[in-house]
Curated annotation (Swiss-Prot):
Gene that specifies this protein: dxs
Cofactor(s) required for function per UniProt: Mg(2+); thiamine diphosphate
Subunit organization: Homodimer.
Protein name: 1-deoxy-D-xylulose-5-phosphate synthase
GO cellular component labels: cytosol
Entries under PANTHER family matching the protein: 1-D-DEOXYXYLULOSE 5-PHOSPHATE SYNTHASE-RELATED, 1-DEOXY-D-XYLULOSE-5-PHOSPHATE SYNTHASE, CHLOROPLASTIC
Length: 615
């Protein structure tokens, strides 16, 4: 007999609506158990979905998706949503090749109204949907679900301001679990904490509800008193000042109260915000105690089966974490900045050693970059630790605020290239292309851990903006040496051959060496995308018949394109054969990194097929 007596009856939201409301609490417990059992096999984002279980059940119980629009922010919390919308049996395939995505994806399900992976986009998208439906005469409801971490992003404020200003009929649900991936920071987060701890304020609201129940004729009077009460005990309610009808905070794990509240709000027209308090990791004791550790889990996290202990190589993030701590000890001008990715960027130790020189600016990439510029103007040396995919969000600031003024800012760009299971929303496919065209920048692509360490040092000491890009995960185990012969814009010949030259940019150097063994080719570690080693390119063009470029970045506009541009400018394009190998002009699905590299033709077999045609 199945232990999922209620869940077994549910494949779609229509099935969910047939379940008596009195059984929703039991269903929520079954959903958590199912999530634990499934992710123990597959792995995946865990704690966020546990925290949003009752909220997800209530939303699909009250609203009529997909006719009603439910828009999720970031997507870490949507595994329960996937279970309730026809993907229960596929959850075990999540983030696997050919399986379902770890994030909402429009091409995957009609219930995934908006594709997501980055933060703070939900309110903007939901507002667009609400207006579009209204203009087309549809009577649908639109809900945006956003966390207390994501709502600190500036884009969320812009959307709130717009929605409140035009009085659009939209519900924003603030899922306040006091815990995004890294601890929330900033004034708004502190404001939420004050609300949560304000027992007197909550008791006032509960008494107000009783008054409303028992004396309906004085509804408007009580509403006015409640507004005044909030003004007395809570600093001016931010959301009501923006034009939203604010409700809450309420218990986000009381599914009965959630259903009741959502039904009321469904009939209340105009912009409204429901503030729910949840606990990330709810129902799984270890995740409740350490939600950061259980934000994402590996297979066998629960059963403990097949878990082996092995000593792994340091990741590139670890190399950065070591470098910044060591450099900070020597240079008091160094300050470290991250947009809410302390753990992922390996800044934990730095934040502990140098708390007054560590700045987590929350999900605010634009602010992070310009803030760094301000620090640089006053003589400090800021290091911005940021993922490649999130650097995209601060492009204007990189150009206008840093490059134009030639300020000393070092970008430590993590997760450059393919990231694997998280898919296209998190791949760092474009940074070389969009950074290379900006004047005043130095761009470095280390081929191993030792180069990464010394390029960080070089970029820090460089007078002007510099960028070092490095991939997710471990390197090849290269030892960090005391020094490295590193000169601005100079490449290094790794292996000497004939006829074929392979110009490698970054950590695909092992692939270049494999090809060199097969074709007796010369391998050159280019090291710098900007400036290019033009002397080396001149020698290569005079010596070799075939030139290959390798990079884990989009081909269009990337490092290989820079090489092409140089050869065209020198009128050499008709005298040599050049082939660029990098990421193709398409978005890749999730999968293992080796699989995605092969799909991008970045493997010995695919490159050999191309080379064999040319030889």
């Amino acid at each position: 007999m199945s232990k999922y007596t209620i869940l077994d009856k549910i494949n779609t939201p229509s099935d969910l609506k047939l379940i008596p409301e009195s059984q929703l609490k039991i269903l929520s417990a079954e959903l958590r158990a199912f999530l634990v059992d499934t992710l123990d096999v597959s792995g995946g984002h865990f704690a966020s979905s546990l925290g949003a279980t009752e909220l997800t059940v209530a939303l699909h119980y009250v609203y009529n998706a997909p006719d009603d629009n439910i828009v999720w922010d970031v997507g870490h919390q949507t595994y329960i949503h996937k279970i309730l919308t026809g993907r229960k049996d596929k959850l075990v395939t999540i983030k696997k090749d050919g399986g379902i995505s770890g994030f909402p994806k429009r091409s995957e399900s009609e219930y995934d109204t908006f594709g997501v992976g980055h933060s703070s986009t939900s309110i903007s998208a939901a507002l667009g949907m609400a207006i579009a439906d209204r203009l087309q005469g549809k009577s649908s409801n639109t809900v945006a679900v956003i966390g207390d971490g994501a709502i600190t992003g500036g884009m969320a404020f812009e959307a709130l301001n717009h929605a409140g200003g035009i009085k659009e009929d939209i519900l924003v649900i603030l899922n306040d679990n006091e815990m995004s991936i890294s601890d929330n920071v900033g004034g708004l987060s502190a404001h939420f904490s004050k609300i949560i701890s304000g027992g007197f304020y909550n008791s006032i609201r509960e008494k107000g509800k009783e008054v409303l129940k028992n004396i309906p004729p004085i509804f408007e009077f009580v509403k006015k008193v409640e507004t005044q009460t909030k003004g007395m005990f809570v600093p001016a309610n931010f959301f009501e000042d923006l034009g939203f009808y604010y409700v809450g905070p309420i218990d986000g794990h009381d599914v009965t109260e959630l259903v009741k509240t959502l039904r009321i709000l469904k009939d209340h027209k105009g912009p409204k915000l429901l503030h729910v308090i949840t606990k990330k990791g709810k129902g799984y004791t270890k995740a409740e105690s350490d939600p950061i550790k259980f934000h994402h889990v590996a297979p066998s996290f629960h059963s403990g089966e097949n878990i082996t202990t092995k000593i792994s190589k340091p990741t590139y993030s670890n190399i950065f974490g070591d470098w910044i701590c060591q450099k900070a000890a020597k240079d008091k001008r160094l300050v470290g900045i991250t947009p809410a990715m302390k753990e992922g960027s390996d800044l934990i130790r730095f934040s502990q050693l140098y708390p007054h020189r560590y700045f987590d600016v929350a999900i605010a990439e634009q602010h992070a970059v310009t803030f760094a510029g301000g620090l640089a103007c006053q003589g400090l040396k800021p290091v911005v630790a940021i993922y490649s995919t999130f650097l995209q969000r601060a492009y204007d600031q990189v150009i206008h605020d840093i490059a134009l003024q030639n300020l000393d800012v070092l970008y430590a760009v993590d997760r450059a290239g393919l990231v694997g299971a998280d898919g296209a929303t998190h791949d760092g496919s474009f940074d070389l292309a969009f950074m290379r065209c900006i004047p005043n920048h130095v761009i470095m692509t280390p081929s191993d851990e030792n180069e990464a360490y010394h390029m960080l040092e070089f970029g820090y000491e460089y007078n002007g903006p510099a960028m070092v890009r490095y991939p997710r995960g471990a390197g090849i185990g290269a030892e960090i040496t005391g020094s490295l012969d590193l000169e601005l814009g100079k490449a290094k010949i790794v292996k000497q051959g004939s006829k074929i030259a392979i110009l490698n940019f970054g950590t695909l150097l092992p692939l270049a060496k494999q090809l060199a063994e097969k074709y007796h080719a010369t391998v050159i570690d280019m090291r710098f995308v900007k400036p290019l080693d033009e002397i080396m390119l001149d020698k290569v063009s005079q010596t070799y018949e075939i030139i290959l470029t390798l990079e884990e970045n989009c081909i269009a506009g990337g490092a290989g394109s820079a090489v092409n541009e140089y050869f065209v400018a020198k009128d050499l394009s008709n005298k040599i054969i050049v082939r660029n190998f990098g990421l193709q002009d398409k978005f890749l699905n999730h999968g293992t990194k080796d699989l995605l590299l092969a799909q991008s033709k970045l493997c010995v077999e695919n490159i050999s097929q191309e080379l064999d045609k040319l030889i």
